[in-house]
Amino acid sequence: MLNRYPLWKYVMLIVVIVIGLLYALPNLFGEDPAVQITGARGVAASEQTLIQVQKTLQEEKITAKSVALEEGAILARFDSTDTQLRAREALMGVMGDKYVVALNLAPATPRWLAAIHAEPMKLGLDLRGGVHFLMEVDMDTALGKLQEQNIDSLRSDLREKGIPYTTVRKENNYGLSITFRDAKARDEAIAYLSKRHPDLVISSQGSNQLRAVMSDARLSEAREYAVQQNINILRNRVNQLGVAEPVVQRQGADRIVVELPGIQDTARAKEILGATATLEFRLVNTNVDQAAAASGRVPGDSEVKQTREGQPVVLYKRVILTGDHITDSTSSQDEYNQPQVNISLDSAGGNIMSNFTKDNIGKPMATLFVEYKDSGKKDANGRAVLVKQEEVINIANIQSRLGNSFRITGINNPNEARQLSLLLRAGALIAPIQIVEERTIGPTLGMQNIEQGLEACLAGLLVSILFMIIFYKKFGLIATSALIANLILIVGIMSLLPGATLSMPGIAGIVLTLAVAVDANVLINERIKEELSNGRTVQQAIDEGYRGAFSSIFDANITTLIKVIILYAVGTGAIKGFAITTGIGVATSMFTAIVGTRAIVNLLYGGKRVKKLSI
């Protein structure tokens, strides 16, 4: 019989729409200002931590909507941002640096919806507000560090082999030259070092010199490593900030994009992400007196560094260990109530420190704090010129063989200790980064974008509904129900997809798909009217109308989907957001126009003697 659906099709349609509605509902409940407490590396939030948080809030007379332990983190919700800020200040003072206390916006989804993992759509920066950074890796510094490592490595190899040399100098293009006493020593060094360092191109220069430069493959590998490692370290630092759904991705050869939606403390984010602090551990050269140190007359294997008070200290150039080997660090107070940072090393770092200290017991070792800061000047390309700042923060005699754990003192105050421990815990950047573009979108502007987007969607929907009802009467009402179902399904699917983020271009995609859905219904209705004018019966006209329109609707939507797939494959950011919502909308509009409206029409007219259609 014409225009009849089996029961399973009606059940399927109802189930799909109900599921879409359930997963779209969380978007109606908004968000609560919240404070999120997560454990730092190696520490997890527990029931005991939850009790401590509740007690602190009670003592400070701060009222929370709820405080709960969820998936290893504590989430405290508040009625206003003022209360949220007060709570964060109170909790930061109590929790210490074993926990990350971060401002956040938590979905106010009811528990019964959360139980089925129904969550609101993830909103992009333009809708939720937040901060966007475009960072550039300082490749010159990265390759300069590698040049220093090559110098140290070649010196060590020549000493080990017993080949005498007089001087080692830096050359252009991150190369180096070594001067020997005679050509014989130089030739012996070239033969030995070429085997030991296949990534260096070593050649003779002059009568008694060799020149070593990094191969193109090694330079390319070093650049790639610098960017990739900085991305990993920035991700660790973002985790320390406790930001939900951050974006950290590469852009071009030496740039990194960081997007932090919903973040409220942008100054703190900039400080943590852009910080370049690390530590170097070096032996103090006690053979040079203070007068020589003050005048800078020191041996070639040493250099003068300053303490915070401006006192000169002569350190050997050889670096025993850098912050790259630090796996964990926490701040605390020593027996004299002075701030200190407790350091834990990886196995390789522990072995280096152990082997070095066992042979140097009784000698002073210095902790050198190294940081790159903006000089306020610009280079020829308009980029900020970074200045390397070094400061001896601690000198201590090696009293025993050190292993994987030790502590450093000489830090000014607890805040500085906490900041240093956080940076060391997240990892030292392989090369300094410069923030070349910063864009902050406030929550007010984000809310304005949401309101404008909703207005655009509703306006498009209302105009479409009016058009359909005026032109197609009862069939226009049926098409209207399909449009509403289409919008519900788009929002529900967007909320379900873990990687989908809604942005302003995404809203444009939704508005576009509403137009596509109207187009499909217009095709169907016009085809039915055409069949009726050709003398078909009502039942035949409905059946032929849907059959005849199907191929046109299918072809048009498939070509649109192909374009959407191409946009998603080659596009970035906003283009991908537009492609996702458009693709989802095209699929749901086909479903609601072909299956949804047909189901309603079949219920109303299927198997009945109808002489005239309201179309």
Swiss-Prot record:
Description of the deletion phenotype: Disruption of both secD and SecF confers cold-sensitive growth (strain secD1(Cs)).
Entry-linked InterPro entries: SecD, SecD-TM, SecD/SecF_arch_bac, SecD/SecF_CS, SecD_1st, SecD_SecF_C, SecD_SecF_C_bact, SecDF_P1_head
Organism superkingdom: Bacteria
Subcellular location: Cell inner membrane
Pfam families: Sec_GG, SecD-TM1, SecD_1st, SecD_SecF_C, SecDF_P1_head
UniProt KW keywords: Cell inner membrane, Cell membrane, Membrane, Protein transport, Translocation, Transmembrane, Transmembrane helix, Transport
GO cellular component, one term: cell envelope Sec protein transport complex
Regions of this protein lying in the Cytoplasmic compartment: 1-9, 473-476, 519-563, 606-615
Residue ranges of the TM segments: 10-29, 456-472, 502-518, 564-580, 586-605
UniProt-annotated stretches for the region Required for protein export: 279-426
Topological domains annotated Periplasmic: 30-455, 498-501, 581-585
GO biological process: intracellular protein transmembrane transport; protein insertion into membrane from inner side; protein targeting; protein transport; protein transport by the Sec complex
GO molecular function: protein-transporting ATPase activity
Membrane topology: Multi-pass membrane protein
Entries under HAMAP family matching the protein: SecD_B (MF_01463_B)
Subunit structure: Forms a complex with SecF. Part of the essential Sec protein translocation apparatus which comprises SecA, SecYEG and auxiliary proteins SecDF-YajC and YidC. The SecDF-YidC-YajC translocase forms a supercomplex with SecYEG, called the holo-translocon (HTL). The stoichiometry of the super complex may be SecYEG:YidC:SecDF 4:3:1, YajC is in the reconstituted complex (with SecDF) but as no antibody is available it could not be quantified.
Function: Part of the Sec protein translocase complex. Interacts with the SecYEG preprotein conducting channel. SecDF uses the proton motive force (PMF) to complete protein translocation after the ATP-dependent function of SecA. The large periplasmic domain is thought to have a base and head domain joined by a hinge; movement of the hinge may be coupled to both proton transport and protein export, with the head domain capturing substrate, and a conformational change preventing backward movement and driving forward movement.
Family designation: Belongs to the SecD/SecF family. SecD subfamily.
Protein name as annotated: Protein translocase subunit SecD
Gene name of the encoded protein: secD
